[in-house]
Amino acid sequence: MLQRSVFFLSDRTGITAETLGHSLLTQFDGIEWKKHYASFLDSAAKVQEIIDRINTIAKQEGQPSLVFSTLLDPVILASVRQADCYLIDFFESCLGVLETALQQSPVRIPGRSHILGQDASYFRRIAAIQYALNSDDGSNSKILADADVILVGVSRSGKTPVCVYLALQYGVLAANYPFTPEDMGVVRLPSLLQPLREKLFGLTLSTSRLQAVRVERYPGSHYASFVECQRELQWQNELYQQFNIPFIDTTGVSIEEISASIINRMRLERRLYGT
């Protein structure tokens, strides 16, 4: 398999460069990426160190490295341009277009999107994360009614990580409720969920995937058997159909896609960054 080195450079956290860069790299198959990260490049010494590293690796591999950048300082950026690399700078390519459209020069302040408490977004995120943790697995029924969305599904179907992601990325108040064997039998909504039906969104997955997840945690148990996983999923999916609960099959789907689908289908408000 072809190998290529790729660098993610930033004068702050590097989250933007990493996220956008990874999204672009997924469009190219058959390449093993050797990833290098450098954040908080805020001095000439740090920048020179990473430039030397880029040049050394390029010489070793006999080809320029790829560099994804969100560097804002034009002097630092100019230095990186001299390295033996293909530079993809997200801010520089976008800021020029925005400057023309808005007829205003950018302030070029690194880390401005991460300034603590600069607006209500920070506090919304913290509150949403705290809510997701407090309401995990239906542990606090008194606050379920406060949810923007309540994820339902059998045990180990991935509800908790999706709730936390919805809170972290969108500021959504996401609770979750696990269907247990005690709920199963007659296909009906648990009494706690009946008045909250409009907030429910279901997660499902393949029997083999659910079994694999459960076996990791409880190997050899009845809980992790194929027959039990199949039985629980069949009951759950019949419930979704009977009560018209929207749901998504999460088998092989990323948490980002699952969350975006929930936001879209439930028409939830994005509470962060003014979106």
UniProtKB/Swiss-Prot annotation:
Key words, A-Z: Kinase, Nucleotide-binding, Serine/threonine-protein kinase, Transferase
InterPro entries (UniProt xref): Kinase-pyrophosphorylase, PSRP
One Pfam family it belongs to: Kinase-PPPase
Binding site for ADP: 153-160
EC number: 2.7.11.33, 2.7.4.28
Reactions catalysed, as given in the entry: [pyruvate, water dikinase] + ADP = [pyruvate, water dikinase]-phosphate + AMP + H(+); [pyruvate, water dikinase]-phosphate + phosphate + H(+) = [pyruvate, water dikinase] + diphosphate
The organism's place on the tree of life at top rank: Bacteria
GO MF annotation terms: ADP binding; ATP binding; phosphotransferase activity, phosphate group as acceptor; protein serine/threonine kinase activity
Class of this enzyme: transferase
Function: Bifunctional serine/threonine kinase and phosphorylase involved in the regulation of the phosphoenolpyruvate synthase (PEPS) by catalyzing its phosphorylation/dephosphorylation.
Family: Belongs to the pyruvate, phosphate/water dikinase regulatory protein family. PSRP subfamily.
HAMAP family: PSRP (MF_01062)
Record's protein name: Putative phosphoenolpyruvate synthase regulatory protein
